[in-house]
């Protein structure tokens, strides 16, 4: 029988290949670049492990629990909550459901009001039910936050910056249901970083896949009814095809318009610092409107990430192209330390960190017409959960077809 062919060795493609391998299927995984993982990449610079963009592993995701061995990833965890910048200092906002007494102490800070506490109770009650990531309603996250009636300070200093970081969308124009979905994940799980970097997720998925099943530097240029053609001119026949590429590449390969593909970009900067400056293992949020979205001291999260007494900081902006000197200045000003304490290591501008939620009907209809199975987080919603889920569903679909 002709093999199943998977195009794209990002998380969705790796997940599909992993499950096909478990089922003993005949398949090949094609990847245009020289490495697996897609957007989920890490690299080591001057002894520091740097992720490509600010990426965390959410332990409560059902597909994460189903697919990954979290113990082997050797995770370090962010604290549940965040520090927000209030007037001239950072004020902790602890998860009220994890540290209720510490949270209550913040009521007099000016960040949270008694009404906010009541509204958070409503959100908590809402999260006790099953929460769909996408429920079909047209309301946006920003509109939902305004409608709920939280105080101005709580919205502008915590809710909006926090959700902007989750969605990489300053306008908060993603579906409102994602607000409840992500809040439930943060309430029930933890945000974590693998010791070897976020790229360890891709490596773990690939561990089970024999090297002769993966072909790197094998860009596909054309898809026919029963074969794919590589840039080299080689043709590979297939029985079933899984297209696990990014939405724009999928559009190109299917020959359809990219009109419904809208990327959400970000740039993450890494600095070596002389001190930890009393920072706790929490995300530090900047006020709404700041060119810097958030930052954290990764050494506070994983003390073993220090190199020769130095400390690793990451800082993320939704503005691609902002200078590292500007980011350094903002960091220094808000921590009250000299800018010379920070030494720039590297930045990762990623124009397509995530994709704005769309129904992608043009892509889906064309793929269905040609008997091609799509995979990728864009087919559901932007997250590791959706990438893993879509890869699993794609594998299950093609296995049913070939049986």
Outline where the language-model segments fall.
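Conserved FAD-binding subdomain of flavin-dependent enzymes
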Residues: 42, 46-79, 110-113
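Helical element adjacent to the flavin cofactor pocket in flavoenzyme catalytic cores
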Residues: 179-227, 240
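Conserved flavin/dinucleotide-binding core of flavoenzymes
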Residues: 298, 303-403
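Mobile amphipathic helical/loop "lid" adjacent to a hydrophobic cofactor/ligand pocket
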Residues: 65, 74-172, 187
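N-terminal Rossmann-like FAD-binding beta1-loop-alpha1 element of flavoenzymes
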Residues: 2-29, 399
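Glycine-rich FAD pyrophosphate-binding loop
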Residues: 21-45
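Short beta-strand to alpha-helix junction loop
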Residues: 55-62, 133-139, 148, 184-206
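Mid-domain catalytic core of redox enzymes
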Residues: 221-329, 333-334
